[in-house]
């Protein structure tokens, strides 16, 4: 597992499950659009951003960008890094049919793609973080 200093913010539990198999990090899910009305979760994200910094990693579909933009406006941008996954057509194994936009989400990405996304976002990765 790869240690990550920042808190990783994802849309849902399947995204969180996928990332927790790769990264040793605090991972918080927004419950999709649920974060819009969840003042406690938003307050938690603000506190975590101040303490450790955040990396936002949402799906590359329209919903993911709406959530990402909401968080951009709600949390000090200086404390938030933006990680992006590529647009790849397909469907996740657990789903019977593709998403509305036909793109793979965070949960459908390979470990290498997710590691690269965090690295490109400037997340603090590495073994030296084990003692944080």
Which residue stretches match the model-derived regions?
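Acidic, glycine-rich catalytic loops of TOPRIM or P-loop NTPase phosphate-binding modules used
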Residues: 3-7, 13-17, 21-51
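Short beta-strand scaffold positions
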Residues: 10-11, 58
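Acidic, metal-coordinating catalytic cores used for nucleic-acid/nucleotide bond scission
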Residues: 34-35, 57-67
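Short Gly/Thr/Asp-enriched flexible loops that form oxyanion-binding sites at enzyme active sites
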Residues: 66-74
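Long, charge-dense
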Residues: 73-124
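Conserved small/polar residues in nucleotide/adenosyl-binding loops
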Residues: 130-132
């Amino acid at each position: 597992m790869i240690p990550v200093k920042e808190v990783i913010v994802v849309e849902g539990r399947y995204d969180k499950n996928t990332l927790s198999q790769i990264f040793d990090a605090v991972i918080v899910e927004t419950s999709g659009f649920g974060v819009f009305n969840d003042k406690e979760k938003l307050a938690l994200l603000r506190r975590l951003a101040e303490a450790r910094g955040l990396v936002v990693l949402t799906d590359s579909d329209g919903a993911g960008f709406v959530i990402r933009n909401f968080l951009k406006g709600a949390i000090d941008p200086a404390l938030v890094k933006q990680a992006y996954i590529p647009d790849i057509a397909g469907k996740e194994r657990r789903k019977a049919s593709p998403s509305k936009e036909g793109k793979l989400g965070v949960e459908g990405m390979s470990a290498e793609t997710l590691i690269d996304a965090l690295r490109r976002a400037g997340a603090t990765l590495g073994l030296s973080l084990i003692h944080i």
